[in-house]
């Protein structure tokens, strides 16, 4: 189960929070979901090069607040905040509602699974070898303090005629452990050979109750790097 399901959805209410935070009524539920989708799709496309890792949508009775977490917030804000005002007006026109936009900096961009997946996808589109792109992202996550990372790419890798899946794993990524803080990201690389899917799982440690310590017998010593494996 843990191997198949989205690890973020599996941990909602345990150690992850929802990215859409509002209480719907039956009358407004479809409209609110549609608006959230439009806002996220627009901002992801418009701010792609700003390194957006997360978009939070909060609603109150009269206000809609959008929080954008990005690795390069300066691109979004612009000189003297001019760009963010233009962005707010564009999103307001999109959903016909008054919107407040907050920008937060992603302090540990190397340990963000979504940014790592987009980084690999961008390199694949630039014709970088997929193994080199995967190893580079793994090294960046380890430097940022990740306890484990798994990167998987699937498609016509290197222009091969038959599609296949290959992945690298460094450290531990316990997908079945619900208290484990697993970050997950997905991106697609649009190449001349077709689309290549990129998935990234990053293990950031375990969330334990107060007064409980992690198992001291657990082996935390560094292990030899594992070779790339081909999926079935």
UniProtKB/Swiss-Prot annotation:
List, for all copies, the residue spans of the domain called KH type-2. 39-107
Query: Which key words tag this protein in UniProt?
Result: Ribonucleoprotein, Ribosomal protein, RNA-binding, rRNA-binding
Q: Name one GO molecular function term.
A: mRNA binding
Q: Name one GO biological process term.
A: translation
> In its keyword annotation, does this UniProt entry include rRNA-binding?
yes
Q: Which portions of the chain have biased composition (kind: Basic residues)?
A: 223-232
Gene Ontology CC annotations of this record:
cytosolic small ribosomal subunit
**PROSITE patterns noted in UniProt:** KH_TYPE_2, RIBOSOMAL_S3
| SUPFAM superfamilies per the UniProt record, alphabetical | Prokaryotic type KH domain (KH-domain type II), Ribosomal protein S3 C-terminal domain
SMART domains, per the entry = KH
Q: Where is this region: Disordered?
A: 213-232
Q: Where is the composition biased (Basic and acidic residues)?
A: 213-222
Q: Spell out the subunit comment.
A: Part of the 30S ribosomal subunit. Forms a tight complex with proteins S10 and S14.
Q: What does this protein do?
A: Binds the lower part of the 30S subunit head. Binds mRNA in the 70S ribosome, positioning it for translation.
Alphabetical list of NCBIfam families matching this protein: rpsC_bact (TIGR01009)
- Give the similarity note: Belongs to the universal ribosomal protein uS3 family.
Q: What is this protein called?
A: Small ribosomal subunit protein uS3
Please tell me the species this chain comes from. Answer: Campylobacter fetus subsp. fetus (strain 82-40)
Taxonomic lineage: Bacteria, Pseudomonadati, Campylobacterota, Epsilonproteobacteria, Campylobacterales
């Amino acid at each position: 189960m843990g191997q198949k399901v989205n690890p973020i959805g599996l941990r909602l209410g345990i150690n992850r929070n929802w990215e859409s935070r509002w209480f719907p009524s039956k009358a407004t539920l479809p409209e609110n979901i549609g608006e959230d989708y439009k806002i996220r799709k627009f901002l992801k496309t418009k701010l792609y090069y700003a390194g957006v890792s997360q978009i939070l949508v909060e609603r109150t009775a009269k206000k809609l607040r959008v929080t954008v977490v990005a690795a390069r917030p300066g691109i979004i804000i612009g000189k003297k905040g001019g760009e963010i005002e233009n962005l707010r007006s564009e999103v307001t026109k999109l959903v016909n509602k008054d919107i407040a936009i907050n920008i937060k900096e992603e302090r540990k961009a190397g340990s963000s699974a979504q940014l790592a997946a987009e980084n690999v996808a961008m390199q694949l589109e630039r014709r970088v070898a997929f193994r080199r792109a995967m190893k580079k992202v793994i090294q960046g996550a380890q430097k940022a303090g990740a306890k484990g990372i798994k990167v998987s790419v699937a498609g016509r890798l290197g222009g091969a005629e038959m599609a296949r899946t290959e992945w690298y794993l460094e450290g531990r990524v316990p997908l079945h452990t619900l208290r484990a803080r697993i970050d997950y990201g997905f991106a697609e690389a649009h190449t001349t050979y077709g689309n290549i899917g990129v998935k990234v799982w990053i293990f950031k440690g375990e969330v334990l109750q107060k007064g409980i310590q992690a198992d001291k017998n657990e082996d935390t010593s560094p292990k030899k790097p594992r070779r790339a494996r081909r999926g079935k």
